Every structure is written in structure tokens, then in C-alpha cells.
């Protein structure tokens, strides 16, 4: 095993500098670790991946105001590792907070995970027993064809970037002993921790190497990125709907429905996941759709979409596709409109469609 310990850096909200881009989710769910993909927060996906990789101790480090949400959001699973929840001190930067984990890390290499990515590759298969030396880091990187702005920004600040053209950090790194102390002053914007960490290490004479990964997804700034992550997560599910209440309903493919979910007079074509307390009636739910807790879908068609908790979708005249419907949102039909329909609705929004 390459590392027996891991630190999950559960950062807060991200802000994109790209013109015209804005958060598609408000409230605590806007923090990347809490965004649900296949009805499970990214933080829970990260913990599951570390557990499967054989990590024995995990510390989740979250800023003040977010730490309470992170511990409540994760299901009480029978992890094989010891899990510690830590709150970042007010005013403390990322680097200083990591340096403050000296007792937990005990001068051992560790996995740093930003809880904003998904992987189908097991951790222990990625590095084949390699581990970084003192003051060194191994960063996982992924192809960024057409999405290389972050790479350009990194290379502009550094004469010898560890990132190849069209590659950017994948959100996970293995850090050697001494790295956290060297990076004590690092305090980047959420989502750019690994870029700044690599910059600081190289400027100080440290070695930063990279390993390309495949079958990997990392969170972007828009709804399309979230939908792609949801598709990625749903591709691996196995059918499990035996406990749900089903009436005059056709189930096709991999469908997961919580035992408290109710589905009546509908067609559900997987991969689809239906959360606790959700109710689907006289509707079609197509592939790559996640339906959150207490959602109501009535007399509508939807596919390749994410419906956040407590939203209601009722009597639409056109199929809802490639859409993100925020928590508590209302989408309903009042008047006839052309068939094409694509929406991203924020938390608490109410939209009536003619």
C-alpha cells in the first residue's frame, strides 16, 4: 500500500472567473464536497474510493461553517478506516491547516483528496507501490482538451511546469514528508490547491511528478460538468428497487429506488436512481437521471438530469433533458410552448412553463 493515511480537503464554494458563469446551486449544497452525484455527496464518493484503496486513517478538514454539514451529509457506513472530522481554524489558510496535522500524519506520505472528483481506477493500481520522497509530490492529472485554461495559468507562473500540455490536476495527490511544512503559506482559491502547491514546491527545489489517469471525472464550473459527473457515477450502479412501492410501472435497466420511494404508472429506464420519499407518477424517467429526496415528478418526462431534494416537476408538455433542477424548485406547465426544453433551476426557484 502506497499510503496508509489520507486528508480530504473539503473546501467551500467556488467562484469562476469565466464570463457568464455562475453557481447553479446555492446554500450548503454549493460546496463541492456536498454536491450529490447519483444521490450521494462527492465527499462520500471520495471516502468510498479511499476505503477501497486500503487507506487506514482519514481526516476530513473543512472550513468553519462547513464542517458540521460535511459530517451530517455522509452516510454512516462501515468504513474500514478510522475517520476524523476536523475544522479549519478561523483565518487559517489551507497550507497552515495542513501543516497543523503533523501529529496525525506522523511523518508519513499521505493522500490529499479535494473531494471534487470521481474515479473508476483503484488507488493502489495508479502508482504501483511508488511513493514520494521527502519534500516530493506525485500529482494525478487528466486530459483537458478544450478546457486548458487552468494549465495556461499555471505555466505562466512557472518556468518548468510539471503539467504536460492539455493536462491539469485531477484533484488527488500523494504528498511526501515535509511537503505540508514547505507549503505552510499556501492559501489558494478553492479548486486550485494542487496548482499552487506544485508551484511552491518547485520554487523551493522540491520534485513534483505526475501520473496520467483515465476513467476519471473532476468537477467544473457549470451544469454540464455536473451532469457529466452524474452520468459517470450512475454508470456503475446495479439494480436495486425491490423495497420500493411500484404500481403499474415498467422498470428497464439498472434502476435504484429507495424503499420509501413510490412509483406509479410510469416507465423508468436506467441507469436511474430515485431517492427516499420521492414520488413519481404517470411519468417517464430516462437514463442518467438522479431524483433526490422528497422529489415529486407528476405527468412529465425527464432524462439525463439531476433533480435536487424537494423539487417538484409537474405536467410538462415537453421532455426535460440535460437539466439541473435545484432544491425546492417548482417546474410546471401552464401554457403550451415549443417542445424543446432545457433549464437549469437554482435552489428555491419557481418556474412555470407555458
Task: Show the residue positions of the predicted features.
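Left-handed beta-helix
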Residues: 1, 189-354
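Conserved beta-loop-beta/alpha segment of the NTase-like Rossmann-fold superfamily
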Residues: 68-153
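Short coil/turn segments at beta-strand junctions that form active-site/ligand-binding loops
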Residues: 2-4, 56, 107-109, 135, ...
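Short internal beta-strands
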Residues: 57-63, 139-141, 306, 324
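Conserved beta-strand termini and adjacent loop/short-helix elements that scaffold enzyme active sites
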Residues: 63, 86-88, 140-142, 162, ...
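Structural motif
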Residues: 9-13, 62-65, 114-116, 141-143, ...
Amino acid at each position: 500500500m502506497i499510503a496508509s493515511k489520507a486528508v480530504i480537503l473539503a473546501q467551500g464554494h467556488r467562484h469562476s472567473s469565466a464570463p457568464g458563469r455562475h453557481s447553479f446551486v446555492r446554500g450548503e449544497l454549493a460546496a463541492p464536497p456536498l454536491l450529490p452525484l447519483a444521490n450521494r455527496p462527492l465527499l462520500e464518493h471520495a471516502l468510498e474510493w479511499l476505503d477501497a484503496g486500503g487507506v487506514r486513517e482519514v481526516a476530513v478538514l473543512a472550513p468553519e461553517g462547513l464542517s458540521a454539514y460535511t459530517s451530517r451529509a455522509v452516510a454512516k457506513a462501515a468504513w474500514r478506516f478510522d475517520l476524523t472530522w476536523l475544522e479549519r481554524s478561523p483565518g487559517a489558510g489551507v497550507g497552515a491547516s495542513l501543516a497543523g496535522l503533523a501529529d496525525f500524519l506522523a511523518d508519513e506520505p499521505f493522500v490529499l483528496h479535494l473531494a471534487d472528483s470521481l474515479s473508476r481506477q483503484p488507488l493502489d493500481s495508479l502508482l504501483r507501490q511508488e511513493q514520494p520522497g521527502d519534500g516530493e509530490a506525485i500529482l494525478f492529472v487528466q486530459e483537458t482538451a478544450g478546457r486548458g485554461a487552468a494549465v495556461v495559468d499555471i505555466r505562466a507562473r512557472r518556468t518548468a511546469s510539471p503539467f504536460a500540455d492539455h493536462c491539469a490536476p485531477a484533484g488527488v495527490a500523494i504528498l511526501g514528508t515535509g511537503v505540508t511544512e514547505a507549503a505552510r503559506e499556501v492559501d489558494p482559491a478553492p479548486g486550485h490547491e494542487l496548482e499552487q502547491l506544485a508551484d511552491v514546491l518547485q520554487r523551493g527545489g522540491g520534485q513534483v511528478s505526475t501520473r496520467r489517469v483515465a476513467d476519471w471525472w473532476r468537477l467544473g464550473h457549470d451544469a454540464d460538468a455536473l451532469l457529466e459527473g452524474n452520468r459517470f457515477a450512475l454508470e456503475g450502479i446495479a439494480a436495486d428497487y425491490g423495497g420500493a412501492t411500484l404500481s403499474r410501472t415498467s422498470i428497464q435497466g439498472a434502476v435504484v429506488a429507495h424503499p420509501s420511494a413510490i412509483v406509479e404508472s410510469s416507465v423508468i429506464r436506467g441507469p436511474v436512481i430515485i431517492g427516499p420519499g420521492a414520488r413519481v407518477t404517470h411519468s417517464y424517467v430516462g437514463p442518467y437521471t438522479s431524483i433526490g429526496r422528497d422529489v415529486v415528478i407528476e405527468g412529465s418526462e425527464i432524462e439525463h438530469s439531476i433533480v435536487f431534494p424537494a423539487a417538484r416537476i409537474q405536467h410538462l408538455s415537453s421532455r426535460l433533458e440535460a437539466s439541473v433542477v435545484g432544491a425546492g424548485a417548482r417546474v410546471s406547465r401552464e401554457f403550451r410552448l415549443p417542445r424543446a426544453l432545457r433549464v437549469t433551476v437554482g435552489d428555491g426557484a419557481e418556474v412555470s412553463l407555458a
